[in-house]
Amino acid sequence: MNTLPEHSCDVLIIGSGAAGLSLALRLADQHQVIVLSKGPVTEGSTFYAQGGIAAVFDETDSIDSHVEDTLIAGAGICDRHAVEFVASNARSCVQWLIDQGVLFDTHIQPNGEESYHLTREGGHSHRRILHAADATGREVETTLVSKALNHPNIRVLERSNAVDLIVSDKIGLPGTRRVVGAWVWNRNKETVETCHAKAVVLATGGASKVYQYTTNPDISSGDGIAMAWRAGCRVANLEFNQFHPTALYHPQARNFLLTEALRGEGAYLKRPDGTRFMPDFDERGELAPRDIVARAIDHEMKRLGADCMFLDISHKPADFIRQHFPMIYEKLLGLGIDLTQEPVPIVPAAHYTCGGVMVDDHGRTDVEGLYAIGEVSYTGLHGANRMASNSLLECLVYGWSAAEDITRRMPYAHDISTLPPWDESRVENPDERVVIQHNWHELRLFMWDYVGIVRTTKRLERALRRITMLQQEIDEYYAHFRVSNNLLELRNLVQVAELIVRCAMMRKESRGLHFTLDYPELLTHSGPSILSPGNHYINR
């Protein structure tokens, strides 16, 4: 029997990072918006982003140059239209962020005029990265959170996970297949609630938690990708998971990122004996794209049997380092490492999901009323490798374009008054929570070993066999026991793990972030790896 939902709104946004909150603020003057946040509202990847946002603000730079740099970094399979769409709208979307109160670093030019301080990162041919010292994400997130919490038309539900999307045909509604809301796990009450919405937006971030080592916060469990797949959406390019080259190697800070901007400002990568190695791998040295740098570090670690490599900027003046990287300097100092005096131990770690749910220029998915923006989506911008500081930019541009489309379509959106409640009549409390913990550790370990920086066909086949066994265990557990946060995340992440492996098995070449010893060369013609629910297939 259908009942009135516990929550109802015009637009439900699942995720509270730069993508979700920028969209919420653009919509809220005209629409009622609910934002779901899995943890505290600031606990997402945006808050921890150090580098900055790429946009053309320098008169010596150009949109064409930004486009070409992105296409080169994407290793030949970016969607040129998407790249041009993002680059051409970058400045206006960054200006909107500035208008919201975000403070980027400035400096005084030789002519006495003040301008934004632009830094350069790997893959960029010009200085075009706007930043707030070395904590850009924190500045962006805290500004947007403050605006959202004070807007009368935005409700932020913290500690609330989406369990699954409610799709019309699965609950017996007639007409075109569309999304009508979501079931939501209230972590405070430990109950599943119903939320009706005329439009639903996935802004859930990526899936790097599928790997043992990651720079991401604990919530990056691929929820949006898995829910969209179950709802009937296509996904693409999930074999391209970016491994950030420089995560801190330290037992007390295993997911701490050392920003690309350090290398942009002259830091060197060194072996334990103090010698540089990046010039041996790429003429751009430390400023090569991330996939090349990560593989080089991985290669040197395995060749030397070393636990880590080192990042060294101690040749720069100490005042320069403290001024440009105050957060990193203080963090490392607290761990007994002086960035101004010594090299920092680093390893690669899973950082960014370049593929995701297939969308158009407005973030629309294959299901009517369902949008996906930010890291959860596949727009074609990143291709086989994301260029530094294009990720926050993608969040802003598609937050704007999705808002335009949602507003345009809202007068014609379907409205319903009742939805089926969550059915717990045939489940009981879990009796063996240790099973979930064991499955967590097993999944993340074999994904790191078999589907990491370097892959083989045999490793992928082994991973898929283990994923299939885990899925059977998890599905049985999900069917018989009440949901929990760990169970929901594990169910989603093992689904995304399968999609990652299936995409990787499709690609019979090494391109960008996907490197396999069995197919080390590039194919002459290639394109995105696309999976469709019900029948896995390649569309290139």
From Swiss-Prot:
Question: Which residues make up the annotated site Important in orienting the L-aspartate substrate?
Answer: E121
Q: What is this protein called?
A: L-aspartate oxidase
Impact after mutating H351A: 1170-fold decrease in catalytic efficiency with oxygen as electron acceptor. 83-fold decrease in catalytic efficiency with fumarate as electron acceptor. Decreases FAD binding
Note whether Hydrolase occurs among the keywords: no
Q: What is the effect of changing R290L?
A: Loss of activity with both oxygen and fumarate as electron acceptors. Decreases FAD binding
Q: Which residues bind FAD?
A: 16-19, 38, 45-52, 161-162, 223, 375, 391-392
**Temperature dependence comment:** Optimum temperature is 40 degrees Celsius.
Recorded family membership: Belongs to the FAD-dependent oxidoreductase 2 family. NadB subfamily.
Misc remark? The chemistry is similar to that of typical amino acid oxidases in which the transfer of the hydride from C2 of L-aspartate to FAD is rate-limiting and occurs in a concerted manner with respect to deprotonation of the alpha-amine. NadB may have structurally evolved from succinate dehydrogenase/fumarate reductase-type enzymes to gain the new functionality of oxidizing amino acids while retaining the ability to reduce fumarate.
- Signal peptide extent: none
Annotated catalysed reactions: L-aspartate + O2 = iminosuccinate + H2O2; fumarate + L-aspartate = iminosuccinate + succinate
Task: Specify the enzyme's EC class, one word.
Answer: oxidoreductase
